[in-house]
Structure formats: C-alpha cells, structure tokens
Swiss-Prot record:
Gene label: alaS
Organism: Caulobacter sp. (strain K31)
Protein name stated in the entry: Alanine--tRNA ligase
Keywords annotated in UniProt: Aminoacyl-tRNA synthetase, ATP-binding, Cytoplasm, Ligase, Metal-binding, Nucleotide-binding, Protein biosynthesis, RNA-binding, tRNA-binding, Zinc
InterPro entries linked: aa-tRNA-synth_II/BPL/LPL, Ala-tRNA-lgiase_IIc, Ala-tRNA-ligase_IIc_anticod-bd, Ala-tRNA-synth_IIc_core, Ala-tRNA-synth_IIc_N, Ala-tRNA_ligase, Ala_tRNA_ligase_euk/bac, DHHA1_dom
Gene Ontology BP annotations: alanyl-tRNA aminoacylation; negative regulation of DNA-templated transcription
SMART domains (alphabetical): tRNA_SAD
Entries under SUPFAM superfamilies matching the protein: Class II aaRS and biotin synthetases, Putative anticodon-binding domain of alanyl-tRNA synthetase (AlaRS), ThrRS/AlaRS common domain, Translation proteins
Protein's UniProt keywords contain Metal-binding: yes
C-alpha cells in the first residue's frame, strides 16, 4: 500500500518523465495577487501564464501545490472534522500545458497514470464530460475504451470552467472512482449523486475558449490544459479506505493526539481528533509561509483555525497546550516534501504554544458563559447574537467557533444579531480581501513588457548609467511623450536605480534628458521585472530619448548600510533569542532600518545590548561582503536563509556577511537577497537600536540607525545625560541614581497628597451635609461633589463613607479635576438586590453628558466631560433612588 508521500512522488515523477518541469509549490500567500486570500487551487501560481500576462518558463509543468480553503468564497472550515473529505489544507496534484498539448494527450496521461502507475482497476473508473464536448467523449472511448454508460454528459457549469466574467474558459472532464455498491450514492448527474459511492478524483480542464465582455466565446489560438487531483482523495482510494482521515498521514497525526490526550478517537470524540489533525496541518503551513495570527485579514483566518482546534483540545480534556506538541509529528511526516516546515519548526512550535496559552486564559470562562446561555435551549434553539458577540469580543471566540460549539446539541446562532452587534460596536475592522483584479496601469505594464523585455539592472556596480526611454505612462496609460510639470512613470532599457522589493526602498535621484534634470522620487517594480521610475518632469521627455540616470549616491550609501545591518540583526536575533525567530518583514531606506520578527515577548535590556554587541563586532571585522548567483534550492541546501513567502526566480543572489563569532571558518550571515549592500562590513561603521516594540501578537519590531545617523543619536543621548548632570550638579555616572531617588520621592509625596485629599473629602464637599447621610425615600445617601479629587482617590473616599452607613445605604461621589467629572457609586451589600451601583453610576454619567459607566452591583465608576453638570449627576441618582 503506497504512502501519501510515495503517491505524490509517483505523480510528479510520471509527468517529469513526460517532459514536464517539476515546479515546487508556491507559498500559500498569493504572490502579486491581492484578489485571493490564500492559494486555493493548483493553477493559481500559473494564473498570469494562462491569461497571457506572463510568458511560461516551460511549455509543460507539474506540481503538488499547497492549498488552503478557510476564508472568503472558498471556506470549508465549518465542515472539517465532521465529513470524510473536507479539509482546510490540502495538496493539489496537477499537470499543465501552456499552449503545448491538448485533450488527447491530457486524457492519455490521465488514463495511463491511473491504470498503469497507480494500478487502479479500470472497471472502477468512469468520467463526465460537458454535454456538448463530443470530442472529449470520443477520446475517452478511443483511449480508455470506455462505454457510453461510463461517459456521462453533464449540462451544468460543474463541467464548464471559467476564470471570471471574461478570460480563458473551457469544458471539463472529471474522473470518478466507484467505491462499490455497499456505499450509498449514485453516479454523477443522478438524483442521489451527493452520496459517497462515486468520488471525483481528477478534473481535467480544457481551456479552449476566451470569454469576451459581450458574451461571445472565441476559440483560443493555443488552447491549454489545467488539471487538478486532490492528493488526500487519491491516497484514500489507493490505500483502500473510504475516509480521507484514515490515510497514513492522518492516522499518524490522530495517533499522536490520542497519545497526548489519553482519549481514544471514537464516538463523539472522533471529530475533535480530526479537527486537531487537519487544523495543525493548515496552521503549521501558514506559519511556515510567514502568516502570523492577528485580528485581521489572513492572520485572523489563521487565528480562527488555531482556536477552533484549541477548543477541541479543551473538549478532549487536554490540561496543557497541545498543538505545539503535535507539530514535530507533522514535520516528520511532511518535512521531506516541504523543507520549509523543517526550517520553520522552532518558530511554528513557539507560535502555537503562545497562541494556545493566551487563548486558554479566556477559553474556560467563555465556555462557561456559553454553557450558561444555552442551558435552557434544546435542539432547534437559537443562541442570541448578543451573547455570540460577547464571546467574540470578550473571550476571543470567532463566530464559527461558537457555531461549532453548539452544533452537536442542534443549536444554531443568530448570525444577523451577531452582525448587528458587530456593526454597533465596531471594535474590529477586517480587511476586505475581495479585489477586482489588476489595475489598468498594471495591465498596461504587462503589455509594455512584451515589447521591451525585462529591465537590465546594473545598479550593483554603478550609481550612474546611460539608458534609452522605452515607455512613458501618464495617469495609468502609455503615452509617446510628456511635458514639463507632469508626473510620469518612465521605463529605461537599463538602469542603476534599485526598484523597491525585499523591504528595501526604491532609489531616488535624477534623470537628465536634453540637458534638463528631472527628479526621480521613487522606483518601483512592475510586471515582475520592469524597473519603473516615478519622475517629476522639469522638461519634455519622449519614448526613444537617451538619458543619463543618476542615483542619489549619498542616500544609496546609507540604504546599503541599513540593509546589510538588517541581515546582521537577523543572524544576531537567532543567536541571542533562539532558532524560533523568523523574519516577518523589514523596511530599509536612507534614514533607518526596521526589522520585524517572531518572538513571544519584549526584549530585555540585556538582550538588546547583546544584539548590538554582536552586530558591532561583525562590523569591526571589516571583512568583504561576498555575493554569488545560484539556484534557489542549491542556495538553501548550502545554508542560505530564505524568507518565507518571498518569490524567487530560477537564479538568486546569495549574500554572505562577516565571519562567525563562535565557529572558525563559518560565515556570520548567509541570506538570499537581491538588494544593494555594503562592500565591507566596516562600511556600516556603527549600529544602534533606538526602539523595540510589539506590532502584532507574537511579532516584535526593532528600529535601528547606522553610520553617521547612529553617531549623531549617541551624541544627542550623551548631550542629554550631560545636561541632566549639570542640572543635578552630579557626575554623569550618578544621574540615573539621582533620577531614581527623585521618582521615589515624588511617589511618596503623591501618596501623602492622596491621603490628604481623602481626609479633606471626608470632612465635607458640596451636595450634602458633612455630618451624615440624607434620607431619600427611605434609603440613606451620602452624596458629594469633591473638587480636586480624581478617580483613584474617589474609590478610597467611597469606601470610608460606606463604613459610616452602618444601617446600609448608597454613596454617590462626583470628583472634579481639570473641568472633567469622575463618578463613583458604592452600594452596601444589603441593598444590591434593590439598587445596582452600575445602573446608578450610568444614570449620573448620562445626566452629565457622558456615555455610560462600568462596574458591578456594589461598586461602579464612570466619567463625563462636563464637570459643571456634577449636581445634575447626583440629582439623577436621587431620582433613581426615589423610584
């Protein structure tokens, strides 16, 4: 029985032997395609090839593409764990022809692979074709010898594929496997086709038409092939099981989950183990491709997946975080096919652990609230949207997690009510990932590229070059010429200007034409490898002009230093913090460097000092930087660090900086990078971290300066220290101790002042007699307006007044500071059933023009912007007490 890994290899090797380029899986985050949340099909990385926007590097290709369907239009999340074939992560095996072979060869390849290499019984296979695609039906008869009853014609769009309202499209032919008559279900096209007997295992798409805007379909001059076979589905067939979760990969993951939880994967507990196994896979691969859990966009989808699995771990009784302990099993199963899993294993484990620890803090309380809210509901009942929103807002329960939690009891959630609460509160904003495709300008650049070819970048060796204007784009449209005063995008045949990529800002400078210098304010990449200059024209410019392009050399020098320093920081973070650190982003320009990385908490002063010391030690080595061109896989196997989610071409530039501080003969930093860098580490001169902060859950950011900017920063810091020393009349070395003493003295004085205010407040104040409480409809009330007493002091004053109410009562205080009012209400225990401090405080705040108050039945506080209405607030409380 072949393993999942063996099946994948057999597929790729078959097509590799048939002159297909074996293409590694693209990252799950789509490259240069904002219209997609995640890669969700095997053809996505080839989208621009099929549309004609890019030239295919090979006429034939094959791949096993990582895919995620857990958000947006394609969302399988709710079904995962409860069905035999739904997954959030799956692998799509595919073979592709870009204008090379067509239907006959595609069908021949499919039939040969399935019946010869996969050894599937021929009598177990049947196919569907689009009802008008007689050509495909005839080919199935000719090649496979299928009878008419095993070639089913389908008239619906299930067997006609299109990319959108316009673009390439064509009929499909789907191949089905018959599990046997002991499984319920009918063949495709029959009334009971949704049964599990006949399972689709391969879809062949014949792209032979182009859909025009007016509704017409025209034949493509070079039709193409796009096929997709779910690896998990074909593995189930070949391993003789009917359920994807019974294949070898999932059996190993579920066995590990069973071992760690001590709960068998049977009965009501089986879906939980399946959810954990599936979600571990999608979470780990998303983390490996650079996605981090957050509250918006892709990061929020990842967090939803992780938390759904973590709730199921909670249901299994796992007392400690579980997911991170399962990750090594996944890496052992899939790390050979996907080396990025192995490279990111430490980071995956750490992120899973941190996220589960954070969620477990609120998970138990949230489940308690959910149990309480659903206690009176039976099957068919509906959980109100307000409670679902509270679970989301307060306890971090995504809506689908709440829906999943109540589904076993037959309870649904009022999603409309949830949406109303979400809209009202507006506490979170999720990015709208639905896009409309490429802009007209971007499409124009693809057309220009077909005529011009890629830009010849010579900026590694020089900052000035002569070039020819190949294209000018004004307001998104190509033009032949432009006049002074226009802001245009200019393409040259060769340039020394670096275009923004890899976190390095685009170069600025000047372009000289006809003796006039025009300012270049930015340089960006278009259509993959066109270096486009944003130019503020000071004179006329036309296509074909010869120009001199000069980079701002001073800015390029500092940018180089900052970029090289970022590489050294990356290496230093690994040494100081550990191998879990992964780069999450960077921005380097002529002013400073910013580096984002995965780590669970703030850096200590000692860690920051050690990072600075390492980087400056490598700078002082003053050894030459080394660059080398090689294939991406060769570079990674040689130890170069590749950035997750970065798209690399057939050849990459490998940068080596410095010598190891601990191992003789080893380099300090080796990374794949196409940016501009220093010639020697000593050119960086000096490195200084100026800030360190968190920017997202599990992501920290370092900002730093190099060279002259770092020197000026240190001089400024020294100047501040000297000024303080002069002010305190003490040596610089003793300034910190002097400041600590002053801070301690101030805190002591503040405590004394607060106590004095409290004692003064207890002696009187407007709004009531200082001698004791007043009677309001039988309730004792102490009401005061206290000038100069803030919220912190009010609590202590309220507690003291409360002690005076020996027979029960209410304390209502309004503190006035800086024209604003702070309201504090305290209710004795014997009256909380009758009066709520929270309700009384809210009434006072609203009467004073505020929004509301927070607290409990015995104590509450709130604030209002207008202190002149303090008495109105107390009057509102009196009215509430009087009923």
């Amino acid at each position: 029985m072949p393993s999942l890994n063996e099946i994948r290899s057999t597929f790729l090797n078959y097509f590799g032997a048939a002159d297909h380029a074996i293409v590694p899986s693209a990252p799950l985050v789509p490259q240069n395609d904002p219209t997609l949340l995640f890669v969700n099909a095997g053809m996505v990385p080839f989208k621009n090839v099929f549309t004609g926007a890019e030239t295919p590097p090979h006429p034939r290709a094959t791949s096993s593409q990582k895919c995620v369907r857990a958000g947006g239009k394609h969302n399988d999340l709710d079904n995962v764990g409860y069905t035999a074939r739904h997954h959030t992560f799956f692998e799509m095996l595919g073979n592709f022809s870009f204008g090379d072979y067509f239907k006959e060869q595609a069908i021949t390849h499919a039939w040969t692979l399935l019946t010869r290499d996969f050894a599937l019984p021929k009598d177990k296979l049947l196919v569907t074709v689009y009802h008008t695609d007689t050509e495909a039906a005839d080919l199935w008869k000719k090649i496979a010898g299928l009878s008419d009853d095993r070639i089913i014609r389908i008239a619906t769009n299930d067997n006609f594929w299109s990319m959108g309202d316009t673009g390439p499209c064509g009929p499909c032919s789907e191949i089905f496997f018959d599990h046997g008559d002991h499984i319920p279900g009918g063949p495709p096209g029959s009334p009971d086709e949704d049964g599990d007997r006949f399972i689709e295992i391969w879809n062949l798409v014949f792209m032979q038409f182009e859909q025009m805007a007016g509704g017409e379909r025209v034949s493509l001059p070079k039709p193409s092939i796009d096929t997709g076979m779910g690896l998990e589905r074909i593995a189930a067939v070949m391993q003789g099981v009917h359920d994807n979760y019974d294949i070898d990969l999932f059996k190993a993951l579920i066995a590990a989950s069973v071992e760690l939880t001590g709960v068998r994967a049977e009965g009501a507990q089986a879906p939980s183990h399946r959810v954990i196994a599936d979600h571990l896979r999608s979470s780990s691969f998303l983390l490996a491709d650079g996605v981090t859990p957050s509250n918006e966009g892709r990061g929020y989808v990842l967090r939803r997946i992780m938390r759904r699995a973590m709730r199921h771990a909670y249901l299994l009784g796992a007392n400690e975080p579980l997911m991170h302990r399962l990750a090594p099993t996944l890496v052992a199963q899939m790390g050979q096919a996907y080396p990025e899993l192995r490279r990111a294993e430490a980071s995956i484990v750490e992120t899973l652990r941190q996220e589960e620890e954070r969620f477990r803090v609120t998970l138990g309380r949230g489940m308690g609230l959910l149990d309480e809210a659903t206690a009176g509901l039976s099957a068919g009942g509906v959980l109100d949207g307000e409670t679902a929103f509270k679970l989301y807002d307060t306890y971090g329960f995504p809506l689908d997690l709440t829906q999943d939690a109540v589904r076993a009891r037959g309870i649904t959630v009022d999603t409309d009510g949830f949406d109303v609460a979400m809209d009202r509160q507006r506490t979170m904003a999720r990015a709208n990932w639905a896009g409309s495709g490429q802009t007209g300008a971007a499409a124009a650049w693809f057309g220009i590229k077909e005529q011009s070819g890629p830009t010849n970048f010579v900026g590694y060796d020089t900052t000035e070059t002569t070039g020819t204007v190949k294209a000018i784009v004004l307001d998104g449209a190509p033009v032949e010429a432009a006049q002074a005063g226009a802001s245009v995008d200019v393409l040259l045949d060769r340039t020394s200007f670096y275009a923004e990529s890899g976190g390095q800002a685009g170069d600025t400078g000047v372009i000289e034409a006809h003796g006039v210098e025009s300012r270049v304010t930015d340089t960006q990449k278009q259509a993959g490898d066109l270096y486009v200059h944003r130019v503020e024209l000071a004179g006329p410019l036309k296509v074909g002009d010869s120009v001199v392009a000069s980079v701002d050399a001073a800015r390029r020098t500092t940018t180089r230093a900052n970029h090289s320093a970022a590489h050294l920081v990356h290496a230093a973070l690994h040494h100081v913090l550990g191998p879990h650190v992964a780069q999450k982003g960077q921005m380097v320009d002529g002013d400073r460097m910013r580096f984002d990385f995965s780590h669970g908490g703030p850096l200590t002063a000692d860690e920051i000092e050690r990072i600075e010391a390492e980087v400056n030690a490598v700078i002082r080595q003053n050894v030459p930087a080394q660059t080398k061109e090689m294939a991406p896989q060769e570079a990674i196997e040689a130890g170069a660090v590749a950035l997750f989610g970065e798209k690399y071409g057939d050849s990459v530039r490998v940068l080596t900086l410095g010598e190891s501080l601990t191992e003789t003969g080893k380099a300090y930093s080796v990374e794949l990078c196409g940016g501009t860098h220093v010639a020697r580490t000593g050119d960086i001169a000096l490195f200084k971290i100026v800030s360190e902060q968190g920017v997202a859950s599990g992501v920290r950011r370092i900002e730093a300066l190099t060279g002259e900017a770092a020197r000026r920063f240190l001089l400024d810091q020294a100047g501040v220290a000297k000024a303080l020393a002069d002010q305190f009349k003490t040596p610089v070395a003793e300034v910190l101790a002097r400041v600590d003493a002053l801070v301690a003295e101030r805190k002591a004085l503040e405590r004394q002042l607060a106590e004095a205010k409290k004692q003064l407040a207890l002696g009187g104040g407007s709004g009531g007699a200082a001698s004791g409480p007043e009677d309001v409809a039988g309730t004792a009330l102490i009401a005061r307006v206290l000038d100069g007493v803030g919220g912190k002091e009010l609590r202590g004053v309220a507690e003291e007044f409360k002690k005076q109410l020996t027979n029960g009562g209410v304390v209502a205080l309004v503190g006035v500071t800086d024209g604003k009012a702070a309201v504090t209400v305290a209710v004795t225990a014997d009256l909380t059933a009758k009066f709520s401090a929270a309700d009384l405080a809210k009434a006072a705040v609203i009467a004073m023009g505020g929004q509301g108050a927070g607290g409990k039945a015995d104590f509450a506080q709130g604030g209002a912007p207008d202190a002149t209405k303090a008495q109105a607030g107390l009057d509102a409380i009196k009215a509430a007490l009087a009923g």
